[in-house]
């Protein structure tokens, strides 16, 4: 892994910082685990735009990722580490002893030909998946389930990790990457280690065109619009627009949007740090 800053041969290269891709060992994905992916362009079934700033982008093929890791006791060998255009982390192709092939989110330190395993009896080593009840306190984890058997829902982006803090009855206290501390059922699974591609946050696109390749469209400022289009629009000259608001009129800075009656609030011990 690592990053490199390109030489300023062109204006688009001047500020560009890209990943090294040194950990990638295969460029052609496993055919049985790849599917076509249709882009919506931010439109719904009726063709109406429901999400702004989405459209275009390079054509992608979807890699089927195993987030459940429920083949307990069956060892798997890491065949390759690959690039996935649909996520910031790298993915690893596993060959199970029974012949099945799956993709998983690759953690930092995972090597080709390394053996990994899932289940209660698995050792707490990088790449292994265990129930939270069997993971030692202080261990760095990722790919955390919220309900047993549901599949990993949290801590899946490049470079992030959570930490097992303590145990409380049927729950395990986990410190999330945001700084939030919350309870998770001890039967839920998590994988050992931090997610790969840690330098992803240091990358810079260098030009607007590379953002378009990713499927993002230009974001027009509200103060540049007319009053009919945005609460911050209008005014003589370059007006400030008043208090920052969203297009729907909600305060854009400092307004809490989480539902106070959300069922999962009871599991949050300490809110995330701002």
UniProtKB/Swiss-Prot annotation:
GO molecular-function term, one example from the UniProt record: rRNA binding
GO BP term, example: cytoplasmic translation
Matches recorded under InterPro entries: NA-bd_OB-fold, Rib_uL2_dom2, Ribosomal_uL2, Ribosomal_uL2_bac/org-type, Ribosomal_uL2_C, Ribosomal_uL2_CS, Ribosomal_uL2_dom3, Ribosomal_uL2_RNA-bd_dom
One term under GO cellular component: large ribosomal subunit
Biased composition (Basic residues): 244-254
Record carries keyword RNA-binding: yes
Annotated HAMAP family: Ribosomal_uL2_B
Subunit structure: Part of the 50S ribosomal subunit. Forms a bridge to the 30S subunit in the 70S ribosome.
Family: Belongs to the universal ribosomal protein uL2 family.
Function: One of the primary rRNA binding proteins. Required for association of the 30S and 50S subunits to form the 70S ribosome, for tRNA binding and peptide bond formation. It has been suggested to have peptidyltransferase activity; this is somewhat controversial. Makes several contacts with the 16S rRNA in the 70S ribosome.
Protein name: Large ribosomal subunit protein uL2
Organism (species): Azobacteroides pseudotrichonymphae genomovar. CFP2
